[in-house]
Amino acid sequence: MSLNVKLHPSGIIFTSDGTSTILDAALDSNIHIEYSCKDGTCGSCKAILISGEVDSAENTFLTEEDVAKGAILTCCSKAKSDIELDVNYYPELSHIQKKTYPCKLDSIEFIGEDIAILSLRLPPTAKIQYLAGQYIDLIINGQRRSYSIANAPGGNGNIELHVRKVVNGVFSNIIFNELKLQQLLRIEGPQGTFFVREDNLPIVFLAGGTGFAPVKSMVEALINKNDQRQVHIYWGMPAGHNFYSDIANEWAIKHPNIHYVPVVSGDDSTWTGATGFVHQAVLEDIPDLSLFNVYACGSLAMITAARNDFINHGLAENKFFSDAFVPSK
């Protein structure tokens, strides 16, 4: 069975056999529509069903209002007939192919008790192409976890990852207690549609915890291109000592168009900077977001709260781009 899937407003058409999800069918055809977690948790792949029938698995993301408007999640919906969808399509990703690469652990730096900075070296013949902001799956002993790439494309070709220690986490235990330098690993990627769009709007980057990793990659890429858009970086952590890098402050000092506000959400008597929820700090400084693009990376709770509050403060819904960290299943 071959079913046609037509995308609006791009007019792109691809086929599905009806057994794979709409998202997988699109990616198999090298058609890049919006997605992130691929398991129905984050909602990035939300689309509007214009015509046709789909079989959708249950999910907790879509509201009754979403369903009434014809919204589906392409990562957990399968076509039952020819269908037409209103969904974002990104030709910028058409030249990028997801592959599995061997790599070695070139270096690992532990910062405090719960952050590890990994640098992975690929073979000289393996040239991974990605856009700043995308993520990879790290594969160790047959298990995999998704991590955002923390460095811009280019440089020495290494892949930088920021990993937070998770209590009783199987993968955390491997990374923090078992990994050895030069150990052979594998990565699969790049993946995701989290990248900076090419327009002239000023940018708000919103990061929670190691959600700073893709922000670092995207800002580095903007600096490398001498992009002069106004950039506002807000990075939230529970306490002042949790900030594991000072590079954002260095950017702000060196580049007049880059502005940085670290935000502490917990009880920290030594902290003299911004406090509270990181997205609320944005609204205190920029109460009208109607002329901004927002890129947010962090917990699903942070992403959801930021999206709702930012839209209530003028942000166009299609100007909010996110990559939510969701627990492994």
From Swiss-Prot:
SUPFAM superfamilies: 2Fe-2S ferredoxin-like, Ferredoxin reductase-like, C-terminal NADP-linked domain, Riboflavin synthase domain-like
Keywords: 2Fe-2S, Electron transport, Iron, Iron-sulfur, Metal-binding, NAD, Oxidoreductase, Transport
Residues that hold [2Fe-2S] cluster according to the record: 37, 42, 45, 75
One annotated GO biological process: lipopolysaccharide biosynthetic process
Pfam families per record: FAD_binding_6 (PF00970), Fer2 (PF00111), NAD_binding_1 (PF00175)
Function: Participates in the conversion of CDP-6-deoxy-D-glycero-L-threo-4-hexulose to 3,6-dideoxy-D-glycero-D-glycero-4-hexulose together with CDP-6-deoxy-D-glycero-L-threo-4-hexulose-3-dehydrase (E1) in two consecutive steps. The detailed mechanism of E3 is not yet resolved.
Stated name of the protein: CDP-6-deoxy-L-threo-D-glycero-4-hexulose-3-dehydrase reductase
Species annotation: Yersinia pestis
